[in-house]
Amino acid sequence: MSLREVTNYEVSFYIPLSYSNRTHKVCKLPNGILALIISDPTDTSSSCSLTVCTGSHNDPKDIAGLAHLCEHMILSAGSKKYPDPGLFHTLIAKNNGSQNAFTTGEQTTFYFELPNTQNNGEFTFESILDVFASFFKEPLFNPLLISKEIYAIQSEHEGNISSTTKIFYHAARILANPDHPFSRFSTGNIHSLSSIPQLKKIKLKSSLNTYFENNFFGENITLCIRGPQSVNILTKLALSKFGDIKPKSAVKERSISIRTRSFRRSKSLKKRQDSSKNDYSDLKTFKILNTTWEKKYKNTMCFQQFPECNSIFINSNKVPIMRLLFPVSDKNTRFTKDDIKIYSHLWCELFGDESPGSLSYYLASKGWLTGCFAFTSEFAIGDIGLILELELTNSGWENIKRITTIVLNRLLPSFYVMNIDYLITFLKEQNLIDLVSFLYQSSEDLPMEECSKLSGILQDDLECLTPPNIFKGFKSLIEIDDPNIEKYENTKANIQWWTGQAIKFQNFLKSFMNHDNMRLLLLGNIKSGNIFDKMKNKSDICTDFFYEFEYYTANVHLASDNKFHSNSSYEFNFPTGNLFLPDCVSDPLKLQQLFLECSLKSKFATLRPQIYSEPTRTKPQLVSENQNYEMWILKEDPNFASDNKSVVSFEVLGLGIKPSPEATIHLEVLAQALFIITSSFLYPALRIGYTYEIASSSKGNVTLRFTISGFPEGVFTIVKTFVDTLKLIATDPTFLSKDTLRKARILVRNKYKNASSDNCVKLASVGLLIVLEKYIWTLEDRINALELTELESFEKFCFLFWRNPKHLVLFMQGSLEYADAINRYLNNNFTQHLKISNEGSKPTIRLYPPPSTKDLDQGTNAFISYNGHQDDPNNSIVYFIQTAQRDDIKNLTLTFLTEYLFSLTLVPDLRNKKQIGYIVLGGLRVLTDTVGIHITVMSGSSGHNLETRINEYLSYLQLQVLNRFTEFDFRRILLEPFLNLLKQNSTKQFEGSAGPVDLLNEIVANVQNGDNYTLNNKQMRQHRKVRNKIAEGRLNFQEDHEMIDISFLQKLTLKKYLAFFESKISIYSAQRSKLSIMITSPMAEKEIASRKMFLQLEAFLKINGFAIKNEDLKKIVEHSKGNPILLVKNLFTYFRRRNEVFKLGTVVLQEILKIIGMNLKQRYGSILGFSSQDGEGQEIEKFWNNDTSPIVPLQELPEPNFFRKAAF
């Protein structure tokens, strides 16, 4: 195959200014694969994503989760060309890459990223791309590996059970049209992928082969490749690696003969060569998703127009949440697909508004709401949901009926009858904001994530989206290069056009946002009483088989409730003019000119020499300081960053206030009070892409920190807003009301309630900080302090914080246009930090020591156990081994080498072979003063069992791996590959297998507002890292991996490394310092096992037509006490009493025994006495010592504050 067989399409993409150095191309390979090529000479890595137009909506009815299982098997089971199982994952790990995959209802996406390293003169990316591509040609669905991947899916599913987002999505399925595939459970679990196939004699290998053959062919695949290579080289890579994936014609003719297939294929290629090359209109005909799925759905909508039940009530102890879901289908409607895409985007902006006149503002003022989110969810092609999610207070939960009535009977009608000029102003401004936000967005610095998004977008209806919008992802009313951009001028014709758009949008709201089309999803305490008076078709409370939550469904009718609202003077309104839109971007014609310049620069980038370049790395500069103040700036390379945006952080340390749980809580309440008072004024800034954070110190000292990003003049306005409001709170006793303080306390309480209900891995990680960090207080201490926070004590604290001496750190990045103005304003209105240098006064003495970490004593082998959330059935452990002080470069270097060793062995051994849990992470962990290595696991097994398995792994690693190394093996297998990664600057972090290095940097601010993409983009992450290093006094500004001593490593011998391992890591070391944090589910293990058994048995009996009441079945399961044999006996007795024992039969009883036993063995084997032995597990089992015990006995810490009381 040659490049002449590739069809190229000329597209002038809409791209952000930050993409102007990149080159983009869309092309079609001879086999029908549509590919997007991105050449970026600044990339330090290369990435690829492949999306197949198939997903869980193609699952056979009897094998829920088959698509998900296929996704797992594709990458793990090998291919005919590369048959070694796990080869791909091993290569990714060895080269410090990342990989992932996900399955939705209609798409399956596989993607990976690798540093630009070379091996024997060949780019590693090219060789691994060949392995990756082979999976989509001739995969091996090795039956020996199927059970392992089913276990992984089961563990993944168990991790999802406690996720609020997953619960709501599944609840939407319960309310959906049962005739649509969306209504079916899709993730898969051990029941759907193992029990049912065994019961029905279904061969999974055969099902996987059939699924693959029917769906994995050229025309069903889209591809995105990104790297620093030229577009021609990347196109050649796409062609050489993926061009021989079979097209649909070859798949259809596969059973005929090789000759016939070959002839058909060559004929097809010849035809394509003669077809309209570079034909833009041909690209617009690509509608891969529509073409594939519309045939399957046959005009069936995801949600019925007249459902029996329109509401679901989910029982939960978490913070109550209410979702209003309005299904939108492009079937049986006068609105075009274009209309629906445009208006649904505008709907999100309108109903997510928090400024005065909005629903959010009104409900928050009533004390019913703590958060309002408006978004769309794509359920299937042509079917989306407009979702309004309200995070409620307890008072809000008690007023759900009123809230729903307000939305339907007051908010929506006001939008229909309001002066249409307000709506026109909103539409015009929002269109402009969309263009500004897109043009000024930062460059995507996670190439594989961008590729995964784009390979999926390529399957959209490109006639509707239009090819230029591929990077933008949505259509606007007026695009930036549209000649109609002049419609912003107020001519008569233009006003008529905008009036027409406004009326059409109002009709969109009327058509879809009404009571008949509403679905109500509620999560909270549903057992406290009926939430609605009028409910029809109410079901009994039952337990969902898959997600195990209790719920009931009903049809809720909401009559008009004018009595309650007749006296309300609140007026709902559309968002008004945005004060934060800078003059420089408020002219559409200027924006159009900017876009055209950017587009031309990118278009002709191919004519420039393709020379690899990356941004010049500059260190922050200390430009001004005195004893109580530092001002830092960071200038960015103008070729790679926009000079139109600023990021500003200022951190104020209260020098005269003692760190304590009370002080931390007062600061958190202060942050929330600032948010409550200013959020409605600042919300318009968020619409344009500004962000802000308010946080108390993550390390517990008395520090208040602000971080603000956006256009410079707006950033200055936000700084002034926060400072002025803080001054009023601190100095005016009449300013802060009791109601505002109450709301702030509720927000803090909800934050801790949400944190305590987080997954057990996060709880264990935070638990490590609580035990070891000096000022990181326990949840109990914080809640007690919150209970004692009253208006008088809070105002006293704020006054002291304001009046007492302070230390300011000001850090500015990007545009420095307002740097001096911000510095002066802080001095004059808050900190008075410049008076010290001007008046020559003495510096303020710091009365209290800075944050620090407990230095674990040698010979420590301790653990502490916390309870997890009561709805989470999983357990977890963080097994932390302290290895060095942060400034101990040699031991830090050896710890990094150990992290690399873990990246090669930990996941393959503990997760894939030993199968101790779904989440298995291991690598470097950095605390304030110390560093160490951690192993983190989430599993159904107990914490102590996980501790034992980790000890076995470390013993195996030492005795059977490292001790068998020769010096040659050590250098060839471990040291030289690691040095190679260092030399090629590609050890950014082993995130895939290690998790975050510095947990303190991962703590989210108390208040964080703005677009999630902007808050986590490359510039913001860099800003946080630099800001934290300044605060810690680590002013060399090196990344952690840059502190590795390469010269030391080059001279390292096996003997020296073994000495480190045997002293610091080995379980046989008397000097090792180790601490485990165990999170244990409050649910009793046998209770969980019994609940699982009941749900599995209930499903089995229903499938086979056995009638038994739920209450009777529950009693049978409870009496069996987790014993499958006793369960079968009790079932036999039950049906014998009813003279129906003949129905069971020996075969059915055996199947029950087999299915229940196998299901419970996977998760509860240690409790019920099962053994876990299979081929690959046995191979490693013989090397693992099941009786391994550390030389230092494990001891339990009496309480989380043990070290704090003893050492601090």
Swiss-Prot record:
EC number(s) recorded for this UniProt protein: 3.4.24.-
What is the protein name stated in its UniProt record?
Putative protease AXL1
Keywords for the protein's UniProt record, in alphabetical order: Hydrolase, Metal-binding, Metalloprotease, Phosphoprotein, Protease, Zinc
Instruction: Tell me where on the tree of life, at the top rank, the source sits.
Output: Eukaryota
- Function per UniProt: Probable protease. Involved in axial budding.
Source organism per entry reads Saccharomyces cerevisiae (strain ATCC 204508 / S288c)
Question: What top-tier enzyme class does this entry carry?
Answer: hydrolase
Q: What else is known?
A: Present with 623 molecules/cell in log phase SD medium.
Q: Which residues carry this modification: Phosphoserine?
A: S262
